[in-house]
Amino acid sequence: MEKVKAKKHLGQHFLKDESIAKAIADTLSLKGYDEVLEIGPGMGVLTKYLLDKPVNTRVIEIDTESVEYLGVNYPKLKDKIISEDFLKYNINQVYENKQFAIIGNFPYNISSQIVFRTLEFRDQIPEFSGMFQKEVAERICEKKGSKTYGILSVLAQAFYDTEYLFTVSENVFIPPPKVKSGVMKMTRKEDYSLPCGEKLFFTVVKTAFQQRRKTLRNSLKTLNLSDKLREDIIFDKRPEQLSVEEFIVLTQKIEADGVQS
C-alpha cells in the first residue's frame, strides 16, 4: 500500500526520524500498567517501537486511510486498531477498570483537548507522554509567573508531575509544520486527590484565567463571593501569580465561604 497523504484538516504531520520515534517510545516507564494507547499513529513510525515493548499496545486513529495502512503493514496490530476520534471515544469500552498509558505524536489542532480528556480519566492513566507544538508542551510544564502559565498548566500539574524532555525540529516531519515541536511527559502523582472540591477547583482555575490580566478580586466576581472573603490579600494577585498549591488554598477559602461547585 502507498504511503498515507497527510491531511491538513486532521493536523497531520508525519514524523520521519526513527531515532526521535524511538526516543519518544522510550519515555514510557512501563511501571504500574501493562496497556498502552497510542493516539494518532499515522503510518506507525512510533508504533513499531511500542510493539517491541512488553505491553499490550493499541492505537486509536480517526483517519481511515491511516487505519488501512496500519492494518496492512503492522500485522501485530490485528484487532488492536480503534478507528475512532479519541475525543469522542468511550474509553471504558476497552479500558474499564484498567490502568493504561497514553502516548503519541499528537495532532496539533487537538493536542490541548487530548490533555483535558486525559485529566478526565486520570484514575486510569498513570502516565502520558508525547509530542506537541513546542509552546503547548512548554505551557503544560510551565510554572507560575510566566506569560504562558495558564489553565492547562495548573490543571495538569494538580494531578501529574510534568517534565519537558526535548525539542524537535520542523525538518523531521512530512509535511514540516511551521513551528518547532516539543516532547513532554506527565507522571501521575502518588497522591493525586485534591484537598478541595475538584469541580470547584476546575471552575476557579478556568474562571480566573479567562481574565488573566485582572486581579482575582475582579476575575472571580461571577462566583458571588462575600465582601469579607474578597478582602483577603490573595485576591490582590493575578492568576499567573498563583502556584497550583495556592489555587488549591484559594479554592478552599471559596468553599469555606459557602460557594458550591
UniProtKB/Swiss-Prot annotation:
Recorded hits in Gene3D superfamilies, A to Z, give: Ribosomal RNA adenine dimethylase-like, domain 2 (1.10.8.100), Vaccinia Virus protein VP39 (3.40.50.150)
Sorted alphabetically, the keyword list is:
Cytoplasm, Methyltransferase, RNA-binding, rRNA processing, S-adenosyl-L-methionine, Transferase
Coiled-coil residues are: none
Instruction: Report which superkingdom the organism of origin falls in.
Output: Bacteria
Q: Name one GO cellular component term.
A: cytosol
Report which reactions are catalysed by this protein: adenosine(1518)/adenosine(1519) in 16S rRNA + 4 S-adenosyl-L-methionine = N(6)-dimethyladenosine(1518)/N(6)-dimethyladenosine(1519) in 16S rRNA + 4 S-adenosyl-L-homocysteine + 4 H(+)
Where do the annotations place S-adenosyl-L-methionine binding?
A: H13, L15, G40, E61, D85, N105
Protein localization: Cytoplasm
Q: Which stretch is the leader sequence? A: none
- A Pfam family cross-referenced in the UniProt record is RrnaAD
The principal location of this protein is cytoplasm
Q: Which HAMAP family match?
A: 16SrRNA_methyltr_A (MF_00607)
Summarizing the function annotation, the protein's role is:
Specifically dimethylates two adjacent adenosines (A1518 and A1519) in the loop of a conserved hairpin near the 3'-end of 16S rRNA in the 30S particle. May play a critical role in biogenesis of 30S subunits.
Query: Record's PANTHER family?
Result: DIMETHYLADENOSINE TRANSFERASE, DIMETHYLADENOSINE TRANSFERASE-RELATED
Record protein name field: Ribosomal RNA small subunit methyltransferase A
Q: Which organism is it from?
A: Flavobacterium johnsoniae (strain ATCC 17061 / DSM 2064 / JCM 8514 / BCRC 14874 / CCUG 350202 / NBRC 14942 / NCIMB 11054 / UW101)
